[in-house]
Amino acid sequence: DLWQWGQMILKETGKLPFSYYTAYGCYCGWGGRGGKPKADTDRCCFVHDC
């Protein structure tokens, strides 16, 4: 779930997941902006969204 994802990101990267990934790439965050995923993390968001 979203809470577990956030905890994993914080533990592994030390970054606050919601402020860092809310607008990351083309697909992370609320809705997708379309286009080709920019990186592996963005690709993961793409797979989750689609």
From Swiss-Prot:
Keywords: Calcium, Disulfide bond, Hydrolase, Lipid degradation, Lipid metabolism, Metal-binding, Neurotoxin, Presynaptic neurotoxin, Secreted, Toxin
Matching Gene3D superfamilies: Phospholipase A2 domain (1.20.90.10)
SUPFAM superfamilies named among the record's database cross-references: Phospholipase A2, PLA2
Tissue: Expressed by the venom gland.
Annotated GO CC locations: extracellular region
An MF annotation (GO) of this entry: calcium ion binding
GO biological process, one term: arachidonate secretion
Function: Snake venom phospholipase A2 (PLA2) that causes irreversible neuromuscular blockade in chick biventer cervicis muscle preparations. The neuromuscular blockade is mediated by inhibitory action at the presynaptic motor nerve endings. PLA2 catalyzes the calcium-dependent hydrolysis of the 2-acyl groups in 3-sn-phosphoglycerides.
Protein's recorded name: Basic phospholipase A2 Bmaj-9
Species whose genome carries this gene: Bothrops marajoensis
